[in-house]
Amino acid sequence: VKPVTKIIAIVVAVLIVLIVAIPFLINVNNYRPQIESSLSSALGRPVKVGNLSLSILSGSVQADQLSIADDPKFSNSPFVQAKSLKVGVELMPLIFGKQLNITHLTIEHPEIALLRDRNGVWNFSSIGNQSGNQSASKSSSSPANVSVAKLDITDGTFTLGSTTGKRKPVVYDKVDVSVRNFSFTSSFPVVASAQLPGGGSLKIDGNAGPINSTDTSLTPVQAKVTMSKLDLAQSALVDPELGVAGSADFDGTLGSDGRIAKAAGTLKATSLKLVPKGSPAGVPVKVVFTLEHDLKAETGKISQADVSIGKALAKITGTYDMQGETTSIRTKLDGQGMPVDDLEAMLPALGVVLPTGSKLKGGTLSLSIDSNGPLDKLVSTGWVKMNNAALAGFNLGSKLSAVSALTGKAPSSGNDTVIETLSSNVRYAPDGTRLDQLNVVIPSIGSVTGSGTISPSNALDFKVVANLSGIGGGLTKLAGGGSGIPVAIGGTTSNPTFTPDMKSLATNQLKGLANGGKDLGNVTKSVPGLGGLLGKKKPNQ
């Protein structure tokens, strides 16, 4: 037994000596030019690595620094900078034949800068394109015949920006990417994860490849994508100036043939805000969508976008164009018979401000809105209609007290305003909102028709005619044969004011004088106090 033990001990000792001695006997820095040349040839970019060291136990060569140049059309700064690069090698060929056969690559703690120019071209588009590597042969632009069993990026930082510098770069931390059986000429599995701006998470699991030899960004992809707690304000999905904010979860798929990308899935948003002066919605919003995106043209088609807010359902279809710094859209929003109770908590997100202390209750809302133009100058036109609803906590009758004084009719009581129907044509633009052909029927009061505007600061400027119920006689003649009283609506949406339009009343008074004063005399007799209000002297008592 003892001789066997001694032999084993000697073998172990020799192995230990070899493990310790070989790194000193082999100067792996001699292979640095070969490693740099191999990586530069594969990527089509100049690659530099730092001091090399050999680890027998892990079977790898480690560089204490890695730098990959950017496309000079984008930046003179490195595209990738990393503190460490581990290159897995076959030890036997390296030790006995001094041949460097790479089996796997691990890039640790890299900082990667992703840039997009005004034409939608990315700085990584030329990765792998031999024509972009001055040190490579200029006679061929075909992809390099490179295969790596394992390619990993660990704890990376990706910075997403544009060459114009108009937007603040977006940073994605803790990026991990795992690729197996990588090849430029075939499909390979990819698993990736990242921490999103604002603390959310991203996971991608799928397949990519073969690498497009002309434009890497057009490489085919099939993947499942999951996002959790995406911060819409801090993401790069929309321009921050648009005021979109909230948190979103996404579960869906992404597929691309290198020409057309197709995305489908479900987006669930909470605390959603859609305009700069809006406030977070009190209800979650779910969007089930399908779209197709032309990767070269930077345009797309939204074939489905079903927006659910509680039991309310609206549908969006249309197209978009992402060329340039601002995305333009041409969409149609259609919703029929949507419960107002489910929509009410969404109004703040749209910047809709109701009178202080009030809220919409009951009834249904229908609408059809077409939106056209760049997102920062979007113009939306269409119509809205609401039926059998109520504005709780707001008594319109009491606000019309000045108008009621003309009629001698007491203002309606109660704390709510019941709305039988409300319809209007709508135009929304950055300079404000305009309502035309406004028609509101309120059983306790009558009806209101007219038009007006709401400024970006929510100031009201409406000219309407109040057709108050139970009013006729002389007042009918004053209104030109109808029972309407001209009313000016001012103030703000949170505190509206309603006053008789004295200019219109004066115009009608002049018409009465032109008729010999006959109609005006009848009016002032039938409507107590109206003569004094219009400046007509009362007859001697």
Where are the regions that the model predicts?
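N-terminal post-signal-peptidase region of extra-cytosolic proteins
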Residues: 84-91
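Intrinsically disordered, low-complexity linkers and terminal tails enriched in Pro/Gly
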Residues: 127-144
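Gram-negative outer-membrane assembly/targeting C-terminal domains
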Residues: 502-541
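N-terminal type II signal-anchor transmembrane helix
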Residues: 1-44, 517-520
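Small-residue helix/turn framework positions
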Residues: 24, 55, 59-84, 101-124, ...
